[in-house]
């Protein structure tokens, strides 16, 4: 039996980050986590591009454009969606999730879901580098691993 796995060596790879500006004070912490993960695993700063979009809903379009460019081993999508008093949260979360998954499947480039979806702001803060780790860091790690796995197939 042959086991296929990706490693966490990011050297000589280029990655893109797409970040939603809405709730920027949280998203900036996710970006910091992603940059930390990339740096720790050999990705040079000049091999990371960051694209800002207005909010989470706009992320899939730019992720698709970046993935189709052929320049990147992976694209990390970062944003925060916090439940409010209306059903807006449900629509945004559902469409962003589907959009990101479709981009990855359509382009065969790892497009990683790093969108923090929470019931309240406290939960979002916890997932941006406090009690619950940093989901940006986790997303960057997944991008490196998936990029290497695809190379091994």
Curated annotation (Swiss-Prot):
CDD domains: Lumazine_synthase-I. Keywords: Riboflavin biosynthesis, Transferase. Its EC number is 2.5.1.78. It holds the Pfam family DMRL_synthase. It catalyses: (2S)-2-hydroxy-3-oxobutyl phosphate + 5-amino-6-(D-ribitylamino)uracil = 6,7-dimethyl-8-(1-D-ribityl)lumazine + phosphate + 2 H2O + H(+). The keyword Transferase applies. GO terms for biological process: riboflavin biosynthetic process. Disulfide bonds: none annotated. (2S)-2-hydroxy-3-oxobutyl phosphate binds at residues 85-86, 127. The keyword NAD does not apply. Belongs to the DMRL synthase family. Catalyzes the formation of 6,7-dimethyl-8-ribityllumazine by condensation of 5-amino-6-(D-ribitylamino)uracil with 3,4-dihydroxy-2-butanone 4-phosphate. This is the penultimate step in the biosynthesis of riboflavin. HAMAP family: Lumazine_synth (MF_00178). This is 6,7-dimethyl-8-ribityllumazine synthase.
């Amino acid at each position: 039996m042959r086991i296929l796995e990706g490693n966490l060596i990011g050297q000589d790879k280029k990655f893109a980050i797409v970040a939603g500006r809405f709730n920027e004070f949280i998203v900036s912490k996710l970006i910091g986590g992603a940059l930390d993960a990339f740096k720790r695993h050999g990705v040079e700063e000049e091999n990371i591009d960051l694209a800002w979009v207005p909010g989470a809903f706009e992320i899939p379009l730019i992720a698709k454009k970046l993935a189709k460019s052929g320049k990147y081993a992976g694209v990390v999508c970062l944003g925060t969606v916090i439940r409010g008093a209306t059903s807006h949260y449900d629509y945004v979360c559902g469409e962003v999730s589907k959009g990101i998954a479709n981009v990855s499947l359509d382009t065969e480039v790892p497009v990683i879901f790093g969108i923090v979806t929470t019931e309240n702001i406290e939960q979002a803060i916890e997932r941006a580098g406090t009690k619950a780790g940093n989901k940006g860091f986790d997303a960057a790690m997944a991008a490196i691993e998936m990029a290497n796995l695809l190379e091994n197939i």
